[in-house]
Structure formats: structure tokens, C-alpha cells
Amino acid sequence: ISVDLLDPAEATAKLAGLEDATHVFFAAFQPGAGAAADYAKNIAANRDLLVNSVSAIDKASARLERVVLVTGTKYYGSHLGPYKTPAREDDPRHAGANYYFDQIDWLTAFQRGKPWDWVELRPQTLCGFAPGTAMSILPAIAVYAAISKELGLPLRFPGKPGAYNAIYQVTE
């Protein structure tokens, strides 16, 4: 379904046919202009993506059982610099703006009294593909693999030994 999740009316109309939906996996992201310099610019749009999506599907489907919110290590402040590792789900929120906090707070409040539940996943890296975004390492690895093959080279890890031997979590 092609839908502008920032438009609540369009989201409601186009997702209305999901009356048999039982699970929602939400991993949408809208980078804001200048967001790297001012992370607070991401908050409203990314909260609204979740609000419009979940509100529409909650309205459409009486069979909804669970919403899975995919966040990430920015919850712990990874975008601000080094953070305590291993990170734990019960770690306190970092100081400063973070759209994950707004999403979690909204989803917690919206879900109260509803017959469905929700969970949050926090992978270190989320790989995937969406047109117009450079948020995935997969296309770069694919190009590296294609060039290696074309040159008759074996596919080797393109980083340092420390990165190769590190424990890391990736979700697709």
C-alpha cells in the first residue's frame, strides 16, 4: 500500500482495508532537514508517522493483537557520542531531544484500555531499502561485492579487525 503516513486523512483512508490486520511492524523514519545538527527537528514528523499509522489501523481492525515499534540505539544516546555498554532496556533516558521518547510515550498512552499490546525492539543497525534514503549499509555492501566480483577478487571484510571481531546486532 503506497500511503503518505504524514497525512492522517490519507493514512486512515488507505489503511481502512486492513480490517484483518493482527500485527503492525512500525519502522518508518522521516529525516528532518538539518536534523543532524538539531535532532529536535525529527520529533514531530516521526511521532506523527506512528500516530497516523497506528491510529488508522486501530480504527480499521478489530483483530489487532500487537504493534511492534522498531527504534534503535539512539534511545540510549548513540547519536550523541559514546554511551554505556552493554545498553539495557531499563537504562534511563538520555537528556535531550529524541523522537523515540515521544513515540513510546504516545503509544503507551494510546494503547491503554485497548485489547492489543505493543513491544519495542532496539537493534543497533536497521538494514533495508527505501527509495531516496541512504540509511542502509546494504547497497554499499552490494556495490562492494559487485566490484570485487568484477575484478576477480575474493569478497573480504571491508573494515578493520576490531570491527570484524566486535559483537554487533543488525536487523533487516
Q: What positions do the PLM features span?
A:
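A structural motif corresponding to the C-terminal end of an alpha-helix
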Residues: 52-65, 103-117
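Short alpha-helix in the Rossmann-fold core of NAD(P)-dependent oxidoreductases
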Residues: 38-61, 68, 96-100
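Conserved beta-loop-beta element that borders a ligand/cofactor-binding pocket
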Residues: 106-135
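A conserved pocket-lining segment of Rossmann-fold NAD(P)-dependent short-chain dehydrogenase/reductase
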Residues: 142-170
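Conserved catalytic-site region of short-chain dehydrogenase/reductase
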Residues: 33, 72-82, 126-129
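NAD(P)H-binding glycine-rich loop region in Rossmannoid oxidoreductase-like domains
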Residues: 2-48, 52
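Short-chain dehydrogenase/reductase
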Residues: 43-47, 85-86, 92-105, 134-138, ...
